């Protein structure tokens, strides 16, 4: 059995967001202008039934780590977010929930309620990439006053908060001030993250394209810039070592968010869609199967067996140990 137990779950709850971060997978660049990704099912949200199907599975460890990420959406934009938290704790009271948010949605009352629901091992990570004058350079459209109000409300109600800041050229001189501001609100941890696109042509490209942002327009579907790769050192099989799975906004189970991103990325999708789906596109769908049936599928053995010999391009780009 490849997964005798499940220790960590990433939930991508929706394809809904209040922000227009130019480096996000929600968007794509065409002729130096930014558009909506034409392959994403915008405004989709995972159902409560899917969350139940995941949490009731007996493979989950007692203190399972639940990571509510935002590959293509803002987790708290899910209309039934607090109900999702209740479902998690109903099945696993000791679950460690980690919520990612830009902090610019909902009300202070919502964050107070959330603080009271979360146990002592659970956290919210506020993604704040600057001060009032610089946060909007990347977190385009996020209301600064909302971030401040919601952070204060959550911390004042006893919640555990982290502020995470991606280091950009326009905010690197502010890091100490950002940390001091966060701590003044009651934030317990401040973390910086290296910008993975720093000093790359890709960053130059999206910085320029963000000046011509078509926030409501779907991009035309163009040619495929395939990124297939065969050169690799050794693949670190993170999903198996960490006993982790990923559940997307349509209720499909995958090894990680990188696999999900590949399905709607022109650089990978022509390779990855047949690699994942093969002859049955619903084998990993929780709309059609229990989580137990999904985890017993032979596909996981195929993936594991390929890591040392013929890994897919996503595994090479994300988990090659030489990187």
Language model segments and positions:
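Active-site groove signature of glycoside hydrolases
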Residues: 64-73
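Radical SAM enzyme [4Fe-4S]-AdoMet core and its adjacent flexible, acidic
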Residues: 4, 8, 12, 27-52, ...
């Amino acid at each position: 059995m490849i997964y005798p137990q499940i220790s960590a779950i990433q939930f991508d709850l929706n394809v809904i967001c209040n922000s227009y971060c130019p480096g996000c997978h929600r968007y794509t660049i065409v002729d130096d202008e930014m558009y909506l990704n034409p392959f994403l099912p915008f405004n989709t949200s995972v159902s409560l039934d899917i969350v139940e199907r995941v949490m009731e599975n007996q493979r989950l460890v007692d203190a399972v780590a639940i990571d509510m990420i935002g590959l293509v959406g803002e987790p708290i934009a899910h209309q039934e977010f607090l109900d999702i938290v209740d479902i998690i704790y109903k099945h696993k009271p000791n679950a460690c929930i980690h919520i990612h948010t830009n902090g610019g949605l909902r009300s202070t009352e919502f964050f107070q309620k959330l603080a009271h629901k979360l146990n002592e091992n659970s956290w919210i990570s506020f993604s704040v990439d600057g001060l009032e004058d610089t946060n909007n350079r990347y977190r385009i459209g996020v209301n600064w006053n909302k971030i401040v109000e919601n952070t204060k409300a959550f911390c004042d109600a006893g919640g555990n908060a982290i502020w995470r800041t991606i280091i950009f050229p326009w905010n690197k001189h502010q890091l100490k001030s950002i940390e001091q501001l966060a701590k003044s609100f009651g934030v317990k941890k401040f973390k910086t993250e290296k910008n993975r696109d720093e000093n790359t042509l890709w960053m130059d490209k999206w910085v320029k394209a963000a000046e011509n942002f078509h926030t409501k327009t779907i991009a035309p579907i163009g040619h495929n810039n395939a990124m297939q790769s065969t050169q690799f050192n050794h693949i670190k099989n993170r999903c198996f070592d960490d006993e982790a799975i990923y559940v997307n906004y349509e209720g499909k189970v995958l090894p990680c968010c990188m696999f999900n991103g590949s399905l709607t990325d022109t650089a990978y999708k022509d390779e990855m869609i047949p690699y994942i789906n093969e002859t049955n596109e619903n084998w990993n769908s929780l709309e059609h199967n229990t989580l137990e049936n999904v985890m017993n599928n032979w596909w996981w053995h195929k993936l594991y067996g390929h890591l040392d010999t013929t890994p897919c391009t996503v595994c090479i780009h994300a988990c090659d140990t030489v990187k």
